[in-house]
Each structure stands twice: as structure tokens, then as C-alpha cells.
A protein has these predicted regions:
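N-terminal glycine-rich FAD/FM-binding segment characteristic of electron-transfer flavoproteins
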Residues: 1-170
Length: 170
């Protein structure tokens, strides 16, 4: 082989950036007006795909917005690209790294209750927490604590809501 010496040259023109277009992307997430928010955290870990779908179904029954904890926005679990791009995003984070909200009803499913998250939901009217760990900090922040795994509890809640034909207006 033959070694060829190359000395790159960079001039001012090489360093210029030209903006071709700008687009403002509006968030589709609304935590200011919903009466109900269902949030989920790392408790989805046993079956992330199915558990996110359960949260989605519960939120639909309650006409609720869906929130997440900060760790979820960092995509620690594999779910379909549709669910990933819809829910596991920074726009949905409740807490010091995201939104502060005050719905009438806040359901925390699989949320441990780190103080950063609690800051974002502490002004909620009524808080229901679902967590298998009875020592989870969220227990001290809720009105009703349901000890159980979200995949066991949420289907029962959905069934009961349907039985009672509960309607929550937006």
C-alpha cells in the first residue's frame, strides 16, 4: 500500500448552517383541562405491552388523559412502536421534569410515588393508587390504596365501571 498525506481545509463557508424550514410541533397531551388522569410507572414491567393497553383501556372508559413517570419517558421497556410513540414520551411526564396537574381524579397505576412525581399530582382532588408494594411512598399520597399488580386490578376496575355504566364527562 501507499500512504498519501491528506490535510483537510475548512473555510468559513463550510461552517455555515442554513435553516430550510421551521415547524412548531404542538403537543397533543392536555393536562390542564382533563377531569381524570391515569398515570403509569415502572409497574408495567411484567408485561409492558399488555399493561400499557390496559391503562389505555381504563383511560378510555373514564375519558381520561394518560400520564407517565419520568423513567417511563426514557423507554426502559419494549412495547410496540405505536404505544411507544404515543405514551412513552416526555410530553406525558407528570412531575418536576414534566407537568403539574390537578384533575378531580388521579389514578396512579404501578407508580412508586417518588417525590418528583408526587410534586406534579399532589393537587389532585382524589387519588387512587395501584401498587403491589404496600410500603410504596405513593401510599402516603393517595385517598385509596389498592395493593395489587396493575394487570390484576385494572381489568376489575374496567369491569366494574362498565357494570355501573359510570360516565365521566370531559
Amino acid at each position: 500500500g501507499k500512504v498519501i498525506e491528506f490535510v483537510p481545509t475548512i473555510d468559513e463557508q463550510d461552517l455555515k448552517v442554513k435553516v430550510l424550514s421551521r415547524k412548531i410541533i404542538e403537543s397533543e397531551v392536555d393536562f390542564d383541562t382533563p377531569r381524570t388522569i391515569v398515570s403509569f410507572g415502572r409497574g408495567i414491567k411484567d408485561d409492558p405491552e399488555q399493561n400499557v393497553k390496559l391503562v389505555e383501556q381504563l383511560a378510555k372508559e373514564l375519558n381520561a388523559e394518560i400520564g407517565v413517570t419520568l423513567p417511563i419517558s426514557k423507554k426502559p421497556y419494549v412495547v410496540s412502536s405505536v404505544l411507544d410513540s404515543k405514551y412513552m414520551i416526555p410530553d406525558r411526564v407528570i412531575g418536576t421534569s414534566g407537568h403539574k396537574t390537578s384533575p378531580l381524579l388521579y389514578i396512579a397505576a404501578g407508580v412508586s410515588g417518588a417525590m418528583q412525581h408526587v410534586w406534579g399530582m399532589k393537587d389532585s382532588g382524589f387519588v387512587v393508587a395501584i401498587n403491589p408494594d404496600e410500603d410504596a411512598p405513593i401510599k402516603d399520597e393517595c385517598d385509596i390504596f389498592i395493593k395489587g399488580r396493575m394487570e390484576d386490578v385494572i381489568p376489575l376496575l374496567i369491569e366494574e365501571i362498565k357494570k355501573q355504566m359510570l360516565v365521566v364527562e370531559a
